[in-house]
């Protein structure tokens, strides 16, 4: 019997959030201001696009943190769900105050 399995979008979003939170320099994730707009948005087949909204730790280098989030999220989604995103967009919405 042949078939395929897919992972629900909310599970992929949870995986992406977990991976992002592990990156040094990420103080947290920022929920959207509109209803049902989470901190992680997944779109396209097999999580082709992932968009994360983060709060950056005070003094953390935004470019380096963003690149590390991109790498870790892509690697983690591929390892856990077999879906490597084509794009991982990291949006810094807030900076944590010391």
For each predicted feature, which ranges?
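Short, non-transmembrane amphipathic alpha-helical segments
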Residues: 62-81
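A short amphipathic beta-strand at an alpha->beta junction
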Residues: 79-98
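Structured, soluble regulatory/oligomerization domains located on the cytosolic or IMS-facing side
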Residues: 15-17, 26-29, 66
């Amino acid at each position: 019997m042949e078939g395929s399995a897919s992972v629900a979008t909310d599970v992929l979003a949870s995986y992406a959030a977990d991976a992002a939170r592990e990156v040094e320099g990420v103080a947290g994730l920022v929920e959207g201001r509109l209803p049902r707009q989470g901190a992680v948005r997944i779109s396209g087949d097999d999580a082709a696009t992932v968009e994360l909204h983060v709060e950056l730790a005070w003094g953390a280098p935004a470019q380096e943190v963003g690149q590390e989030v991109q790498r870790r999220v892509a690697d983690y989604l591929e390892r856990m769900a077999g879906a490597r995103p084509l794009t991982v967009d990291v949006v810094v919405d807030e900076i944590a105050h010391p």
